[in-house]
Amino acid sequence: MDKVVSSPTEAVADISDGATLAVGGFGLCGIPSVLIAELQAKGVGDLECVSNNCGVDDWGLGLLLAGGQIRRMVSSYVGENKEFARQYLSGELEVELTPQGTLAEKLRAGGAGIAGFWTRTGVGTQIADGGLPWRYDDAGNIAVASPAKETRSFAVASRRADGSTVTEEHEFVLEEAIATDFALVRAWKGDRHGNLVFRTTSRNFNPLCAMAGRVTIAEVEELVEPGELDPDAIHLPGIYVQRVVELTPEQAADKRIEKRTITPTRDSSKEGV
């Protein structure tokens, strides 16, 4: 089945106000920047977005945030976006902060049809006990706080250094899976059937977001014909992808660097002094 659509505009045509979106990428690596820009131009609003980050002030999801198009974020690391902090603290934006590994597993579980899972991450904190500020009012008071989650003790076996096994009781918290109306992802390569290959860091969250979306839209830097991708090299099978958008060379090359770091040039004239 050929899943290629003619343009980003066509790809996001049925995303409407109030939709929930899982958006791939890690930092600015592998973010579906073209699809995000299309949503910005479309003016769709009241969105709930699930993403590890929220872009920066002028790129990625930061564009939707600046336009007031996002109502709620479920995220892990958001410290690079000043507008995000302003909207959160002023009560304009609701934020559910989630541990990064937990967020990844919630997305994976949603894609696998698993309702929830038990984890030790967050036990003994506001993640499990509740009270984490989700939304402030305009006076800086907590208007909406996270609810307490179900916890339970399980016997966990572990192996000691001497080879013996010990069983201990540990407390776990129940985390519910995440499934969204749509998922937006970016792939390095993809074929017309929606099979995708991600490059380096962009593989961190893109496959998981794609799994969690009921309708997954992938923008691909290079489109190939079915059969050209090595089956063993495919990171995400096409069963999870409903639409594919081929980027132009200019769109594929338009990538931002969040923090530019370089190695200082070595002054060889001072060596051996």
Residue spans for each PLM region:
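Conserved alpha/beta enzyme-core scaffold
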Residues: 1-273
